[in-house]
């Protein structure tokens, strides 16, 4: 066998390997997570949280049929709370009718009923008229926590949930937890994990945005991450003296249907206080 042929076979084998790897990485799977928060002011509680972000949904019935199946799968695990952390639509230039697409996305979120849900916007949502998103959420009676907080009844207990606007699209505005949340379990949701490192932010935070790099290699890590968050805080669980942050890898992808070293997933979190 001559050298050019050997080289060609090698290239084909490598290409097939990466195609199969990419195909598997794009298949959305459940990622089990356990997080424990030490807060002596809060009576002990254990809740099951489903975290979902970076859907990047395109238009079309097939896309929403597939999303409905994902919602059915998530509900089958009986979570007590759904957290949706932004980037619900694909690249703005690919969307033909954003008004209808926006309605379809928000109506799809209603399939999570009767499970309590908390929602914030991501940069893709803000780039497709964040004000219109906020208005449509209100019109369709779905609560949106953009720089505000809400007390929710979760698993028979009151939970204080705070939402921050996306830092990457300059919508972040710091708000403190209200006084009535003092003795309640508290958590924050936002899109860009940098929001967890803004002045005054402490405690438990959930975020998305990074896709865990989408393309990430051993040793060198992600090639590029659109966030100012510390590099060690762009994927999965991060803890320091002020905060506990969990960043989901997300469901979808940006630019190309490509994931190397990262997986499409949603997270099922056993959360204890």
Which residue stretches match the model-derived regions?
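Beta-strand-turn-beta hairpins that frame and shape the catalytic cleft
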Residues: 36-50, 142-143, 150-162, 182-183, ...
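Core catalytic region of metal-dependent phosphoesterases/phosphodiesterases
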Residues: 66-153
